[in-house]
Amino acid sequence: MVEPLLSGIVLGLIPVTLFGLLVAAYLQYRRGNQFGL
C-alpha cells in the first residue's frame, strides 16, 4: 500500500522541482541582465 503513495509523491514532486529550477534560472538570468553582464 506504500508504493502508490510513493509514486504519487514522486510524480507530484518532479513537475514542482522542474518548475522551481526554471524560475530560479529565469530570475538569475534577469538579474544578470540588470547588472549588464
Curated annotation (Swiss-Prot):
BP GO terms, sorted: cytochrome complex assembly; photosynthesis
Protein name: Cytochrome b6-f complex subunit 5
Record note on quaternary structure: The 4 large subunits of the cytochrome b6-f complex are cytochrome b6, subunit IV (17 kDa polypeptide, PetD), cytochrome f and the Rieske protein, while the 4 small subunits are PetG, PetL, PetM and PetN. The complex functions as a dimer.
Keywords: Chloroplast, Electron transport, Membrane, Photosynthesis, Plastid, Thylakoid, Transmembrane, Transmembrane helix, Transport
Subcellular location: Plastid, Chloroplast thylakoid membrane
Lineage summary: Eukaryota, Rhodophyta, Florideophyceae, Rhodymeniophycidae, Gracilariales
Positions of transmembrane segments: 5-25
Disulfide-bond pairs as recorded: none
GO cellular component, one term: cytochrome b6f complex
Function in brief: Component of the cytochrome b6-f complex, which mediates electron transfer between photosystem II (PSII) and photosystem I (PSI), cyclic electron flow around PSI, and state transitions. PetG is required for either the stability or assembly of the cytochrome b6-f complex.
Matches recorded under NCBIfam families: PRK00665.1
Family: Belongs to the PetG family.
Annotated membrane topology: Single-pass membrane protein
A GO molecular-function annotation: electron transporter, transferring electrons within cytochrome b6/f complex of photosystem II activity
